[in-house]
A protein has these predicted regions:
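Alpha/beta enzyme core
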Residues: 3-11, 15, 27-52, 57-76, ...
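Generic N-terminal amphipathic, Lys/Arg-enriched alpha-helix
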Residues: 4-20, 253-260
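A short N-terminal beta->alpha junction/helix N-cap motif
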Residues: 17-25, 50-54, 261, 265
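Short catalytic-loop micro-motif centered on adjacent basic/acidic residues
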Residues: 19-23, 81-82, 103, 204-207, ...
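A general structural-boundary detector
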Residues: 20, 145-148, 182, 207, ...
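Active-site proximal loops enriched in glycine and acidic residues that flank catalytic Cys/His/Asp
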Residues: 173, 208-210, 232
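Internal helix-turn-beta structural module
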Residues: 242-281
Length: 288
């Protein structure tokens, strides 16, 4: 059964570890992440971008697939199904479709409009027993056409959004989506500490978890980050493993062209990436 992300993140915040949010793109992705979470006894958040939602034919399809897998794979660890970087309309659709959590990305609105829209969605989510994440300060890189430059959030704006009753907050601290450029200056721990001071016990979220050095991840967790988003790293691992399979001519051997065989190495590569991240984040064994 799907659960809201709030309880697992409150526990993570208190226990000084983070829960991984791994974006799903299809059946292989979803299965790989769920099986790894179960094997490692780790709570997990399945993230769905609006683009991936369209690709998988809609949010109802995704809810059906995930709920079916939870039952068929006997998944007993806490699993949240979470809309990633949702528009106002996207959040409403996911609330209807049966997601257990949403993120409203109002970071490109003026703060007054962000506050108004966030307030409405907090009310709708909490009425349905769902959790809601909000964002202040655009995360750099490109996420389904929304381009941000890796701003640092204003701690006072973070407090204004936190006070609306959101369950966890993504604050821009110089992090970006996708691959980090060689001249990236690193995370702004000064901003993170200032945000933490303003929002108190509220779990914080780190987007763009791919390519951030392990020591910076651990420091961010010590400063209140309880949810870390990973997507690009799984995509690269999947693509590299699939390319290797084809370059070695394995798709031409026997029935190597069968999609179940063709996609298996990529699926295993996702599992290995998820395992590595769960170990780094400290969530292994936390669902026991």
């Amino acid at each position: 059964m799907l659960v809201p992300a709030k309880e697992m993140l409150d526990k993570a915040r208190a226990g000084k570890y983070a829960v991984g949010h791994f974006n799903i793109n299809n059946l292989e992705w979803t299965k790989a992440i769920l099986q790894t979470a179960q094997e490692l006894k780790s709570p997990v958040i399945l993230g769905v971008s609006e683009g991936a939602g369209k690709y998988m034919t809609g949010y109802k399809t995704i809810v059906g697939m995930v709920n079916g897998m939870l039952e068929e794979l006997n998944i007993t660890v806490p699993v949240a199904l979470h809309l990633d970087h949702g528009s106002y309309e996207g959040c409403l659709k996911c609330i209807e479709a049966g997601f257990s959590s949403v993120m409203f990305d109002g970071s490109h609105y003026p703060i007054a409009e962000n506050v108004e829209k966030t307030s409405e969605l907090v009310k709708s989510c909490h009425e349905k027993g769902m959790s809601i994440e909000a964002e202040v300060g655009a995360i750099g890189g490109e996420e389904d056409g929304v381009v941000g430059m890796g701003e640092c959030a204003d701690p006072n704006e973070c407090k204004a959004i936190a006070d609306l009753g959101v369950d966890f907050l993504a604050a821009g601290i110089g992090n970006i989506h996708g691959k980090y450029p060689a001249n990236w200056p690193g995370l702004s721990f000064e901003t993170l500490a200032a945000v933490k001071e303003k929002v108190g016990e509220l779990p914080l979220v780190l987007h763009g978890g791919t390519g951030i050095p392990a020591d910076q991840i651990k420091k961010a967790i010590s400063l209140g980050v309880s949810k870390i988003n990973v997507n690009t790293e799984c995509q690269i691992a999947f693509a590299e493993a699939t390319r290797k399979y084809i370059e070695e001519g394995k798709d031409l051997q026997g029935k190597g062209f069968d999609p179940r065989k063709l996609l298996a190495p990529g699926t295993e590569a996702i599992k290995a990436t998820v395992k590595e991240k769960m170990e780094l984040f400290g969530s292994v064994g936390k669902a026991e």
